[in-house]
Regions:
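Cell-envelope/extracellular polymer assembly enzymes that use nucleotide-activated donors
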Residues: 5-8, 26, 36, 160
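Acidic helix N-cap motif at the loop->helix transition within catalytic regions
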Residues: 18-21, 46-54
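Short, well-formed alpha-helical segments that are part of the catalytic scaffolds
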Residues: 15-29
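Conserved nucleotide-sugar donor-binding catalytic segment
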Residues: 125-198
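Short aromatic/hydrophobic "clamp" motif used to bind/position activated sugar donors
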Residues: 83
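Glycine-rich, basic loop-to-helix element that forms the pyrophosphate-binding segment
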Residues: 62-78
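A conserved acidic beta->alpha catalytic loop
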Residues: 26, 33, 41-50, 87, ...
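Conserved donor NDP-sugar-binding/catalytic core segment of glycosyltransferases
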Residues: 91, 95-125
């Protein structure tokens, strides 16, 4: 029987051939290698899938066109004890992220670990940003997530997910250490389109 990985790293990707390598390289560079990488290529029409297969054999093809549904597909396939999400245009800050996260969750034993991140548009880190609604600045205990899933809304599905998670009253540990680079204003991303007024 194949051993269960410690982390499942889920990356929903949509037409991200131009920028996904940086994030996948940041995962490949980790000195802690007890993880599985799951890339969900969702409604891709470029060569994102081809690039993803250079990094993992766990590439899932879907046609939702929705980040939340793509994340659900990754969760359904995840075998790890802990779950991390990474957006297709972001990356982990250094090669010791997984080792440090493994130490922290092993030491504190909560259901959810919140960590800080660097925000490209602002250029700073802040402890208050740990409670940001996004799912990528958190490490999740897989059994606690259980059957909780993202909604099928085009935007803000992570808000629905977080509401459902917080209703379960998780044990939370906050760690003021930046682990993640959030590429807030990559052209044509959802955040960029919101700032341009394309999305209400």
């Amino acid at each position: 029987m194949e051993d269960k990985p410690f982390f499942s790293v889920i990356v929903p990707a949509h037409n991200s051939a131009e920028w996904i390598r940086k994030g996948l390289d940041s995962i490949r560079a980790q000195v802690w290698d007890n993880y599985e990488l799951i890339v969900v290529c969702d409604a891709c029409t470029d060569n994102t899938e081809e690039i993803a297969r250079e990094y993992t054999d766990k590439v899932i093809i879907t046609g939702f066109g929705l980040d939340g549904m793509a994340r659900n597909t990754g969760l359904d396939a995840a075998r790890g004890e802990w779950v991390l999400f990474m957006d297709d245009d972001d990356w982990f800050l250094h090669e010791y992220v997984f080792r440090q996260l493994a130490f922290m969750v092993g030491t504190h034993g909560e259901d959810m670990l919140l960590f800080s991140f660097v925000w490209k548009d602002r250029g700073y880190t802040s402890q208050e940003k740990q409670m940001y609604i996004a799912v990528w600045c958190k490490c999740w205990y897989r059994e606690f997530i259980g059957e909780t899933r993202f909604s099928d809304r085009p935007y803000w599905s992570d808000v629905d997910f977080m509401k459902a998670i917080m209703a379960k009253q998780p044990r939370v540990h906050r760690w003021d250490m930046p682990m993640y680079y959030y590429n807030y204003l990559r052209p044509h991303s959802i955040s960029w389109r919101k700032k341009q007024g394309e999305i209400e």
